[in-house]
Amino acid sequence: MAVGKNKRLSRGKKGLKKKVVDPFTRKEWFDIKAPSTFENRNVGKTLVNKSTGLKNASDALKGRVVEVCLADLQGSEDHSFRKVKLRVDEVQGKNLLTNFHGMDFTTDKLRSMVRKWQTLIEANVTVKTSDDYVLRIFAIAFTRKQANQVKRHSYAQSSHIRAIRKVISEILTREVQNSTLAQLTSKLIPEVINKEIENATKDIFPLQNIHVRKVKLLKQPKFDVGALMALHGEGSGKEKGKKVSGFKDEVLETV
């Protein structure tokens, strides 16, 4: 009898399956918190692999960008066509503190505004806020009929388009330079800038559907934990002067 490996004996029994491990047992959930500039601060939840060895869960979470509908953050369906991007900057226990990272329109809203018999005017500026955030802001506007107009269309001449684009760029630059990122976010939500553009351009050509359709973050300053805590309503001036609990007073021996 030849001495060798018996292939039949080395095989496992038929029907046995490998033990399936649920991948979610190695993950943990974190709550995403929006800045205090929004009405609803509870954005949702996200998961990440648990900390093991040299791999820390907080390192995998920092820098993560989530996209949320502005209607969910404000509790109003009037903002359902705008999407807000929030970036995770700090991990505090099971809470993820985020900051504004950008804004955009939904595709269906942009497509619905483009119609016949009117002129589309677009403008964009790259400008720095007062707290050193570099943003690129895109604005969009459409012409409308003048009062008592008989013509069917409301096309604007090239000179009108250039003049309107110049006014829009000047207003956007001024508003961004004189505001912090949090203040600018507060202006974008109620569309304060849009009304200012409409009033400034009514003598050139009447406009409608004026929107800041996109805000893109190009560069951000060095991370400041104190500024982020203030943005989330923590570490404010009301708490100044309070005694910090959890520490014992150290008694020094007299010399």
From Swiss-Prot:
Q: Which residues carry this modification: Phosphothreonine?
A: T254
One GO term (biological process): translation
- InterPro entries, per this entry? Ribosomal_eS1, Ribosomal_eS1_CS, Ribosomal_eS1_euk
Q: Where does it reside?
A: Cytoplasm
Task: Please give an example of a GO cellular component term from this record.
Answer: cytosolic small ribosomal subunit
Q: Determine if Ribosomal protein is one of this entry's keywords.
A: yes
Record keywords = Acetylation, Cytoplasm, Isopeptide bond, Phosphoprotein, Ribonucleoprotein, Ribosomal protein, Ubl conjugation
Q: What is the superkingdom listed in this entry's lineage?
A: Eukaryota
N-acetylalanine found at: A2
Q: Where is this cross-link: Glycyl lysine isopeptide (Lys-Gly) (interchain with G-Cter in ubiquitin)?
A: K248
Q: Which GO terms describe its molecular function?
A: structural constituent of ribosome
> Which residues are recorded with the post-translational modification Phosphoserine?
S245
Pfam families found in the cross-reference section? Ribosomal_S3Ae (PF01015)
Please state which protein family the record places this protein in: Belongs to the eukaryotic ribosomal protein eS1 family.
Q: Which PANTHER family match?
A: 40S RIBOSOMAL PROTEIN S3A
How would you summarize the oligomeric state and partners of this protein?
Component of the small ribosomal subunit. Mature ribosomes consist of a small (40S) and a large (60S) subunit. The 40S subunit contains about 33 different proteins and 1 molecule of RNA (18S). The 60S subunit contains about 49 different proteins and 3 molecules of RNA (25S, 5.8S and 5S).
Q: What is this protein called?
A: Small ribosomal subunit protein eS1B
Species of origin: Saccharomyces cerevisiae (strain JAY291)
